[in-house]
C-alpha cells in the first residue's frame, strides 16, 4: 500500500489526517472502512515504521502480556523541552500489539511527556480504527501501558496506569 498517496487522499485543508475512528464514522458506514483498517494493521505489523531500538535513548521501558506472550520494549529520545524527537519499539507478539505499537509511536513524535501521560485507551482505539474484544484490547493497550510507564519513570507497569 502506498501510504503517501493514501495520506494525500485523506488529508483535510490543513494537511491533517483524520483519526481512523472519525473517518470510519463520518465517511463510510460499511465493511470497506473496516477492511481498510484491517489492511493497515496487517501492513504495519509486516512492515513497521518504528521497529528498532535507540542507542542512546533517554527513556526505555518494556513489559509483556502474560496471557498471550506479547512483549513490547519502547525507546524514546527526548529534547531539552521534554518532547519526543525519536521513538522505536522492539519485541514480539500478535499483529494487533505490534501494529498498535507502531501506530502509537507515530502519534507521539513531537508530543511532550505530559501529553503522553494524558493519553487514553481511546487514543489507541482511534489509531487502530477497529472494534476489539476484551482479549485483543489487552494486546492493543500493551504499547500504551509501556509508553506511559516510561513517561512516568515507573519501575513497573500496572493496568492502573491506563486509567490515569
Language-model features, listed with the residues they occupy:
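Alpha-helical support elements that line or immediately flank enzyme active sites
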Residues: 100-111
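Solvent-exposed residues in well-ordered beta-strands and their adjoining turns
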Residues: 77-79, 90, 109
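Short, thiol/selenol-centered motifs that function as redox-active sites or metal-ligating centers
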Residues: 68, 91-99
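C-terminal binding/interaction regions
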Residues: 2-52, 111-114, 119-164
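Structured beta-strand/loop patches that form or line metal/cofactor-binding pockets in enzymes
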Residues: 43-86
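Catalytic-loop motifs flanking and including active-site residues across diverse enzymes
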Residues: 96-100, 139-142
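A short glycine/serine-rich beta->alpha loop
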Residues: 61-62, 85-93, 126-136
Amino acid at each position: 500500500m502506498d501510504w503517501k498517496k493514501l495520506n494525500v487522499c485523506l488529508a483535510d485543508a490543513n494537511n491533517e489526517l483524520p483519526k481512523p475512528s472519525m473517518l470510519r464514522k463520518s465517511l463510510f458506514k460499511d465493511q470497506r472502512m473496516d477492511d481498510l483498517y484491517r489492511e493497515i494493521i496487517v501492513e504495519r505489523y509486516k512492515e513497521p515504521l518504528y521497529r528498532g531500538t535507540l542507542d542512546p535513548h533517554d527513556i526505555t521501558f518494556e513489559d509483556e502480556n502474560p496471557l498471550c506472550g506479547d512483549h513490547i520494549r519502547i525507546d524514546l529520545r527526548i529534547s531539552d523541552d521534554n518532547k519526543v524527537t525519536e521513538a522505536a519499539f522492539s519485541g514480539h507478539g500478535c499483529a494487533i500489539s505490534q501494529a498498535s505499537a507502531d501506530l502509537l509511536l507515530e502519534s507521539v513524535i513531537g508530543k511532550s511527556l505530559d501529553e503522553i501521560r494524558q493519553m487514553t485507551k481511546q487514543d489507541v482505539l482511534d489509531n487502530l480504527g477497529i472494534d476489539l474484544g476484551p482479549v485483543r484490547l489487552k494486546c492493543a493497550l500493551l504499547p500504551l501501558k509501556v509508553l506511559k510507564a516510561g513517561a512516568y519513570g515507573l519501575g513497573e507497569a500496572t493496568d492502573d496506569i491506563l486509567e490515569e
